Regions:
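Bacterial Sec-dependent N-terminal signal peptides
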Residues: 1-24
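Short N-terminal segments immediately surrounding and downstream of signal-peptide cleavage
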Residues: 23-40
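Outer-membrane beta-barrel channel domains
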Residues: 30, 42-53, 58-60, 64-294
Length: 294
């Protein structure tokens, strides 16, 4: 509790000094992450891309980095590159000049009340306020060998992000999930009493199924031109690949305070987290806490 109060107080102390443009982050798995990794390889030593080991990426910095790369003399882009850059800008209009917004509008006027652009269900971009809201819907069914039961994932929810006065950013992600994972994951859940990537769960009516709620959110702001601060409850990732030995998103969400200092070719990150112990004992009691500083 004392650690949580310390993080909250530190975030509140830093907040009044926020006076620079801020940003929310690209979620893990977003297609723009692949674009960034590709352009990092193509640009080689360009310091704008020299930070791919610390995820998630800042949306504002990603858009600025891509624009910086495109403006370089002699740059060659494939049709796929151009398409992905256009999609990146369409998905992040709050960081695109207002004069360019019109070219991303939906061509069918009758759906513009909601899908004003093909990228987002509902979005508002006015002076001192941006808001983007989207549904989260996923339903998959599959089969696997040596298993008579279908595997499935049923996810419904909503995600929203925005910024206020170009100083404070916010993000939230809320979903309700029911799934029956492949057999090897079911074995992991049975042995560890934990669902990969999730926290508290309960058995679902289907044999081997699980039911869990996923709630994430954070605020972002800038202390100085070169220091970004994020405070909230979400996942963080340090390293490369789908998993990382240093810090992966395989576990549950956690309370965190993150300070990211980026200047010239240097990117220095401080991360403070409150974590929960793995615990398979049931009952009406608090789960043990542990803390990390990286």
């Amino acid at each position: 509790m004392q650690f949580k109060q310390t993080l909250s107080r530190l975030a509140l102390i830093l907040l009044p000094f926020s006076a620079f443009s801020q940003s929310t982050f690209l979620p893990q798995g977003d297609k723009a992450n692949i674009l960034m990794e590709r352009l990092e390889i193509k640009s080689r030593s360009d310091s704008f891309f020299n930070y791919s080991k610390t995820k998630p990426f800042s949306r504002r910095h990603v858009v600025n980095a891509v624009n910086h790369y495109v403006e370089q003399p002699g740059v060659k882009l494939s049709k796929v590159d151009k398409y992905n850059i256009e999609r990146l800008q369409m998905n992040n209009l709050e960081y695109v000049p207002v004069a360019e917004h019109s070219k991303y509008l939906s061509k069918k006027k009758f759906i513009r009340k909601f899908y004003s652009t093909p990228a987002n269900l509902f979005e508002v971009h006015v002076k001192d306020f941006d808001l983007v809201v989207n549904p989260v819907i996923q339903y998959t069914v599959a089969t696997e060998s040596n298993n008579n039961d279908n595997v499935f994932l049923n996810t419904r929810g909503v995600t929203a992000r925005g910024q206020i006065a170009n100083k404070i950013g916010f993000f939230t992600y809320l979903t309700d999930n029911q799934e029956r994972a492949p057999k090897y994951v079911q074995d992991f859940i049975s042995m560890r009493k934990a669902v990969p990537g999730a926290g508290y769960y309960k058995p679902f009516k289907a044999a081997g199924g699980t039911d869990y709620f996923d709630a994430r959110g954070y605020f972002t702001f800038n202390v100085t031109k070169y220091i970004d601060v994020a405070f909230g409850y979400d996942k963080n990732f340090i390293g490369n690949g789908h998993r990382s030995l240093l810090l992966s998103d395989f576990g549950n969400n956690s309370l965190f305070l993150k300070l990211n200092t980026r200047i010239w070719k240097f990117n220095y990150q401080n991360l403070f987290m409150e974590l929960q112990n793995a615990d398979d004992r049931i009952g009406d009691r608090l789960i043990g806490k542990k803390y990390a500083a990286m």
